[in-house]
Amino acid sequence: MKRLVLYLLTLASLTTAAQTITGGSLPPIRPIEKTVYDSALIRVYYEYRYRPDPNNTGKWRKAQTIMLIGDRYTGFADYAQIREDSLNDAYYREKRSPMELVSAVLTASGSGTYDSPLVVDIARNTATVQISGQINCQYTQNLKPAEWTLADGDTTICGIKCRKATCRMGGRDWTAWYSEDYAMPYGPYLFRGLPGLIFAISDTGCNHVFTLNGIVRLAVPQPIYLYKDNQQLVLSRENALKMKRNEAADPQSAMEMSGKSVTFIGEKRLKSLPYNPIELE
């Protein structure tokens, strides 16, 4: 939650300096800078569960994600972040105070943990992905058609009968459940190409699990967008994924490269972090 983190860091510094915080001490609300690609009239919700550490199979994290479907683009993002952006822009238009925004975001936000918003150009079959971290980056890739194998088996998800399919993508083997009753060849993240909407998909090791938990046809179009960030690195997909691997292996160097100061007593360094992305390669 980018803006929330900014406000909380500001609050922390103000508290340390003066022990008193007033709404006027906070930075003013500014609109979220974004690039809008399309407008969506369909929103599909997916619960996202994943294991941050592949060696700790008992520890899970959970987020609510959404897929937005437009005529020319689809988008996929963390729902808590989208709600925070909407609150920010609404409070900016209404000229409300920064303190009111902080309170509203703290009340409304969920556990936003999906950090790679993306858009897909349907006609060109290209995806632009943004990855947040110590250093934010963005890459654009041509999407190769997934080699789906339609398999025997069926199940019911949200009261809808679904069929089974399998594929290999990003160095993992995946099992998906899709419904031809919803004739949209889309799914969460970059999964697409089946003869119906994907209702659930997970890798065979159950490190990443997406399960549909809602579909809404919107009365008012919703923008499909990514963030404008002048400090964001534009990289190739290969270099972007390499950078995130290196950031997990040596988070202190990543912080120093981002311009953030790190001070430790003695010679201790930040420990490496577990790395278990959706795509391994």
Model-derived features: positions:
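Extended soluble regions of mature proteins
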Residues: 20-281
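Bacterial Sec-dependent N-terminal signal peptides
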Residues: 1-30
